[in-house]
UniProtKB/Swiss-Prot annotation:
It is an enzyme of class 7 (translocase). It holds the Pfam family Oxidored_q2. PANTHER family: NADH-UBIQUINONE OXIDOREDUCTASE CHAIN 4L, NADH-UBIQUINONE OXIDOREDUCTASE SUBUNIT ND4L. It catalyses: a plastoquinone + NADH + (n+1) H(+)(in) = a plastoquinol + NAD(+) + n H(+)(out); a plastoquinone + NADPH + (n+1) H(+)(in) = a plastoquinol + NADP(+) + n H(+)(out). It is a multi-pass membrane protein. GO terms for biological process: ATP synthesis coupled electron transport; photosynthesis, light reaction. Belongs to the complex I subunit 4L family. Keywords: Chloroplast, Membrane, NAD, NADP, Plastid, Plastoquinone, Quinone, Thylakoid, Translocase, Transmembrane, Transmembrane helix, Transport. Its EC number is 7.1.1.-. The chain crosses the membrane at residues 2-22, 32-52, 61-81. It is found in: Plastid, Chloroplast thylakoid membrane. This is NAD(P)H-quinone oxidoreductase subunit 4L, chloroplastic. One of its GO terms (cellular component) is chloroplast thylakoid membrane.
Length: 101
């Protein structure tokens, strides 16, 4: 019974992240929504790893790998956003065309 609740929470987080990623015009908000999506995926990895075979740690190891990738994205993403803001004076996604200049 606990599996359904965790999967429902994960689906809810994933849906919020996808909705925010599709509708956001701000790059910082898009990065935050991407983090929500990655956290929902991590929750699924850990849940299914524990539910199907709690002796093996494959889901947990994969989750740690995704967390490290998300940490790198969280470090590099704002640096790219600040660089774009310095050059273009805007971080709105629909106003950026990096191939123009």
């Amino acid at each position: 019974m606990m599996l359904e609740y965790v999967l429902g929470l994960s689906a809810y987080l994933f849906s919020i992240g996808i909705y925010g990623l599709i509708t956001s015009r701000n790059m910082v908000r898009a990065l935050m929504c991407l983090e929500l999506i990655l956290n929902a995926v991590n929750l699924n990895f850990v849940t299914f790893s524990d539910f199907f075979d709690s002796r093996q740690l494959k889901g947990n190891i994969l989750s740690i790998f995704v967390i490290s990738i998300a940490a790198a994205e969280a470090a590099i993403g704002p640096a790219i956003v600040s660089s774009i803001y310095r050059n273009r004076k805007s971080i709105r996604i629909n106003q950026l065309n990096l191939l123009n200049k």
